[in-house]
Every structure is written in structure tokens, then in C-alpha cells.
UniProtKB/Swiss-Prot annotation:
Pfam family, one: GIDA
Organism: Prochlorococcus marinus (strain MIT 9215)
Protein name per UniProt: Methylenetetrahydrofolate--tRNA-(uracil-5-)-methyltransferase TrmFO
Cellular location(s): Cytoplasm
SUPFAM superfamilies linked: FAD/NAD(P)-binding domain
Binding site for FAD: 10-15
Family to which the UniProt record says this protein belongs: Belongs to the MnmG family. TrmFO subfamily.
Lineage: Bacteria, Bacillati, Cyanobacteriota, Cyanophyceae, Synechococcales
Gene assigned in the entry: trmFO
Enzyme Commission number: 2.1.1.74
First-level EC class: transferase
Keyword match Cytoplasm: yes
Role of this protein: Catalyzes the folate-dependent formation of 5-methyl-uridine at position 54 (M-5-U54) in all tRNAs.
GO biological process entries: tRNA methylation; tRNA wobble uridine modification
Catalyzed reaction equations: uridine(54) in tRNA + (6R)-5,10-methylene-5,6,7,8-tetrahydrofolate + NADH + H(+) = 5-methyluridine(54) in tRNA + (6S)-5,6,7,8-tetrahydrofolate + NAD(+); uridine(54) in tRNA + (6R)-5,10-methylene-5,6,7,8-tetrahydrofolate + NADPH + H(+) = 5-methyluridine(54) in tRNA + (6S)-5,6,7,8-tetrahydrofolate + NADP(+)
Named cofactor requirement(s): FAD
Length: 470
């Protein structure tokens, strides 16, 4: 028999949101947080929802992906976004918060809720099968619990480091310069290729070597063996003038028919590029493209500057920059349903960064959905998934859809993803102007979510509780 009391493990953004949604649906919650009795290398307090990196939730304008995600969360009265709005600080067009007041307010809100029981200890194992549980332990999940999650999901389904190449929008690439081809013409032309001559390559390599690095935290530096197994592109460049050319930038076997006869040796030697950067589809439609082999520890501003030196990428727009850091996350497409339930245990949910989403608002969105569904399950009702036309729905669909991991990609190549318009379904009518297209995405999302919200057998009217807190 299922215990109707929901357990939420982790009181970060996702866990805090999940606990709030469950409790406000009238279902009792036990919220487990190990801090401050056991901290992480990145946290400094025992407050809930402590922001350890930036204090920004991203752009406010709903014509931007991050802004639309925030707008959708406001529709569902997200605790995280309402608290962020309450303690916002001036940040131009972004939503940034006073970190201390933000986390203290979250802690007070959750601690004073009559249906939320707070327990401070390190969860060492997954709760028993009869317990409805939301796993929201984040990228710095404790070692002991990580081992138990790994045992439950399978050794290849739980990752402990994030080595991700940049992802760029396909429509920002110069199609006059790049060309489609697979190496040695094997199969369909699965890659877009950016050819470099010798001068391009030498200049590019020099800039990579001189580029400013992001600072690794001490606990990340201790994991040097990881970086040896998956070297940053700038480290490959340092190892020799031609090292990249015989690695991720090798040009052999790639040919553009515009260059003439491949089998004419003289022509081939004359026209063959000195090096080639390859771009691979990140989604089935090819709206998002991954820079193959470009995991990097360069600062984001440097990535933008240096990678735009690649022919064809002069005006590239980045969905996500490359990262190399400690990050516990699941191989979610092989584990989770669009409801955020585990396929092999339907009363166990996952939410937040551990599912492979990136960003504060995305973590809150995962907590929102997991909380709604855990409360529905506790009441004996059917769980739900958000419409794909919404930013929340498209992001959750990406991390829970096996088809998003393309057949031409190697096993376990799923990488965390932020909110992006590249994830949402195409409009029925094509709109060339980007601003108008993004506005249309926003309008479609709002309509779909309002309809979805009206149909949900769930109470969202909680203003009386918020007013007591603030």
C-alpha cells in the first residue's frame, strides 16, 4: 500500500518548489535536507534554495527562452519565481535576486507551512518502495546517496561529471560556407562541416591557447583523471601544433562536391581543407547543433569570441556554452517519463538539475511538475505532463524522450540542456522574423498552459498562504 505522505529529498530550488506544490495540494510532506549538518563544497549556509553560482534567473522578457519559462512558472504560482520577484534587485533586463533574502524567505515559507515537516539529516538510501518520493538532490548529491542511485538506475545511467561541448542555433550558421557530409560518405550526411585553411587554423589554435580559463573549484581540481579522459579542446591545442588536426578537427574523408573531383589527386591536395570543425544534430529537426569534440573550460565570453573565428560560425548564436565541472545527473531519457516518474518505479520522481536540465528556473519547473504529480498520485489520480508547446513541456520532453538521443550518437551522450526555443515544436505557419517568431511561441505557450491549467484537477489558489509569509 502506498504511503500518502510524500518525501522530498533535497531543499534546493527543485525540492523547495516540489514540497510547496505537494503541501498546497493538501498532501503532507517530509522535506529532507542534509545541510548544515553535512554541507557540500559549494554551499555556505543551511538555507533552502541557496544560490551557489549566479544570482540571476536569466532574461525577464518572455520573448526570450528564460523569460518565457519564468512567465510559465508565474501562471502556476511557483514559490521560487514569486520569491524571486519579491526579492529582485536591479539587473537590467534580467531577473536577479538578493541571495540571502531569497533563500531565507524560502526557508521561512517552507518551515512555517503546516503540512511540511522538515528533517535535517543526510539521506543515505532511497526510501522504501511504498513511499512516494521526489529525488531533488542536485548536481552535488552526496557520495553515499549517489552510489545508491547508481545501483538503482544502472552504472551507465548516472553521470558524475559534465563535459559538454557548446550548442548553437542551426539558423545562425552561414550555409554558404559550411557543407553537409559524413566522413568517407558513410551513411547519410549527418554532419555540418566548417572548413579551415592553414592561416585560419593557426590563428584559431593560438587564440585557444591564450584564451582565459574559467576557475575550477578545489573539489573539481581533485578529479584530474576525468579531464584526462575527456580533454578540453584548448588542452588538446596545447599538446602540439597538429594535435587537433589529427583529433577532433581532422579533415580526412570529408569533401564538398563544390570543390570538384575528389578522385583527382592534384585537385584533392589543392582543395582539401587544412582542418574541419564538425557540427552534429542535437535534436531530430537539426535546430540545435553540437560542436563535436569541443568540451572546454574557457570562460563563456572567450568561447563566444574564439569560436566565432571558425568559418561559417561568425554570427553563431549559442544555446549553451561548453562546460567541464562536477555535476551529478541522470541519463534521463532512458529512465524518466514525461511526468518525471521513473519508468521502473512509478512512485519515485526526479526533479531539478539531477534530471539534466540547466538553470534556476528550469530546476523550479522540474520541481513544479514533480510536486503536482506526486500530489496527484497520493490522491489516487492520474499524473500529467505539460503541453509540448510550452517551454516547461518542451524541456521536460527533451530530457524524457529516448528519440532525442540520436542513433548516430554514441551511448550515454545525453548532456544537460537549458531552456531554448530550439526545443519547442515548429509553428504551423513559418515566421522568418525572429522576434515575431519568438513572440508567437510565447502566445502559443500561454494559450496552451492556460487551457492545461484549467483542466487540471488541482488547486492552484494559494495566495492566502503567501500573504501570511510576506
Amino acid at each position: 500500500m502506498i504511503d500518502k505522505k510524500v518525501i522530498v529529498i533535497g531543499a534546493g530550488l527543485a525540492g523547495s518548489e516540489a514540497a510547496w506544490q505537494v503541501a498546497n495540494a493538501g498532501v503532507p510532506v517530509k522535506l529532507v535536507e542534509m545541510r548544515p549538518f553535512k554541507s557540500t563544497p559549494a554551499h555556505h549556509t543551511g538555507e533552502f534554495g541557496e544560490l551557489v553560482c549566479s544570482n540571476s534567473f536569466g532574461a525577464l522578457n518572455p520573448d526570450r527562452a528564460a523569460g518565457l519559462l519564468q512567465k510559465e512558472l508565474r501562471i502556476f504560482k511557483s514559490l521560487i519565481i514569486q520569491t524571486a520577484d519579491k526579492f529582485a534587485v536591479p539587473a537590467g533586463g534580467a531577473l536577479a535576486v538578493d541571495r540571502s533574502k531569497f533563500s531565507m524567505a524560502l526557508t521561512e515559507a517552507l518551515s512555517s507551512h503546516p503540512l511540511i515537516e522538515i528533517e535535517r539529516f543526510e539521506q543515505l538510501d532511497l526510501p522504501r518502495k511504498e513511499k512516494i518520493t521526489i529525488l531533488a538532490t542536485g548536481p552535488l548529491t552526496s557520495d553515499e546517496l549517489s552510489y545508491k542511485i547508481q545501483a538503482f538506475t544502472g552504472i551507465d545511467a548516472c553521470h558524475f561529471f559534465d563535459a559538454a561541448s557548446p550548442i548553437i542555433y542551426g539558423d545562425s550558421i552561414d550555409q554558404e560556407i559550411v557543407f553537409k557530409a559524413s566522413r568517407y560518405d558513410k551513411g547519410d550526411p549527418a554532419y555540418l562541416n566548417c572548413p579551415m585553411d592553414k592561416n585560419n587554423y593557426i590563428h584559431f589554435r593560438n587564440q585557444l591557447i591564450e584564451g582565459e580559463q574559467a576557475n575550477l573549484k578545489d573539489f573539481e581540481k581533485e578529479s584530474a583523471n576525468f579531464f584526462e579522459a575527456c580533454l578540453p579542446i584548448e588542452e588538446i591545442a596545447r599538446r602540439g601544433v597538429d594535435t587537433m588536426r589529427f583529433g577532433p578537427l581532422k579533415s580526412i574523408g570529408l569533401w564538398n562536391p563544390k570543390w570538384g573531383d575528389l578522385f583527382d589527386r592534384e585537385n584533392r591536395l589543392k582543395k582539401r581543407p587544412y582542418a574541419i570543425v564538425q557540427l552534429r544534430k542535437e535534436d531530430l529537426e537539426g535546430k540545435l547543433l553540437n560542436m563535436v569534440g569541443f568540451q572546454t573550460n574557457l570562460k563563456w565570453s572567450e568561447q563566444k569570441r574564439i569560436f566565432r573565428m571558425i568559418p561559417g560560425l561568425e554570427k553563431a548564436e549559442f544555446v549553451r556554452f561548453g562546460v567541464m565541472h562536477r555535476n551529478t545527473f541522470l541519463e534521463s531519457p532512458n529512465l524518466l517519463l514525461p511526468t518525471l516518474q521513473f519508468m521502473k518505479r512509478n512512485n519515485l520522481f526526479a526533479a531539478g538539475q539531477i534530471t539534466g536540465t540547466e538553470g534556476y528556473a528550469a530546476a523550479a519547473a522540474g520541481g513544479l511538475l514533480a510536486g503536482i504529480n506526486a500530489s496527484l498520485l497520493a490522491k489516487g489520480k492520474k499524473t500529467v505532463s505539460f503541453p509540448k508547446e510550452s517551454m516547461i513541456g518542451s524541456l521536460i520532453n527533451f530530457i524524457s524522450n529516448k528519440n532525442q538521443i540520436l542513433s548516430n550518437q554514441k551511448k550515454n551522450k545525453f548532456q544537460p540542456m537549458p531552456a531554448s526555443f530550439g526545443l519547442v515544436p515548429e509553428l504551423t505557419k513559418r515566421i522568418k522574423d525572429k522576434r515575431l517568431r519568438y513572440k508567437a511561441y510565447q502566445e502559443r505557450s500561454t494559450e496552451a498552459l492556460n487551457d492545461f491549467k484549467n483542466k487540471l484537477d488541482y488547486c492552484f489558489e494559494k495566495d492566502h498562504l503567501l500573504s501570511k509569509i510576506y
